[in-house]
Every structure is written in C-alpha cells, then in structure tokens.
Amino acid sequence: MLRSLHVKNLALIRETEVEFGEGLNILTGETGAGKSLLIGSVNLALGGKFEKDMLRRGEESGLVELVFDCEEPRLAEKLKSMDLEPSEDGTVILSRKLSSGKSICRINGETVTAKQIKELSELLIDIHGQHEHQSLLHKKKHMEILDAYAGAEFAKCAEQVGALYHECAAL
C-alpha cells in the first residue's frame, strides 16, 4: 500500500509530501489544482519517461520518492531476485533523482535501473485513470487478481497440484 509521496522541484511543485491513509484514497480538486501532476510524479518514480523540461524552472534537479507499506511474500522474493534486501520494517522506498537528461533510480537506497523499478512496481501499485479499466478485459490480469486475493497458502497448494499433474501426465 502506498503510504506517502514526496516530490521536490518538479514542474510547479517546490516541495510537497502527501500522506495516504488506509483503504481508498481519492484525489479531487478544481481544474489546474495539480492532481495530474501528483499522478505524473508517481509514474516518474515508477520508471516513467522523464523530460528535462519537467523540472521546476531554475532548478538543476528534482526528486520523487514513494514509500510503500508491504509485507507480501512475493515482494520479498522479487527484491531478493534483484539482489536487494527487504527493509526490516516492511517498507519499500522507491526514489528517482531527476537531473538534466538523466535520472538515478533507487529501491531502499540501492541504485537500480528504471526497468527494475518498473518490474517491482507491478507488485506494488496499479494506477487507473479515466477509461483505463480495460486491463480487466485481459484474462492474464484475472488470474493475477485471483492469485493475489487467494494468498500465499493457495499459491503453494496450486504449485503442488501442478507438480502432481505433471507427474501423472508423465506416466
């Protein structure tokens, strides 16, 4: 679950911190209030495309940081597969320092590639805008949602059933 967003020197934002609560969080406001800028900041932190003109005018660098609260076993496995250590308190911090023409991505303080952040972010967050509900039309997404809902114990059972099936098929 996304706990907080920290943005510094991006577009019109000098520096801001947004804390998110349990459950559903909704961004509302008048046109031009900055809702899209906040969502764009999240996308940047998740490895989205960065252009130099996204920096606040007159600034050399910017920063976007996301803090997630997550103790899901799949996440810990993914971190280990990337040679990264999960934090002791169950948080995952994704950060991206943006400067003229380049950026530095980090997961829990370790420098990583934008591709690695994108891979990890698939386990952390799902952002939907207007008319973006089409992901529910993909059968693969159905299984991902059901597997996430069922939990780790079910995944272990499904793995055992699969192994037994392959044993029987080999006979």
Language model: regions and residue ranges:
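Gly/Lys-enriched N-terminal cap/neck module of very large, oligomeric protein machines
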Residues: S4-V7, A11-I145, Y149-H166
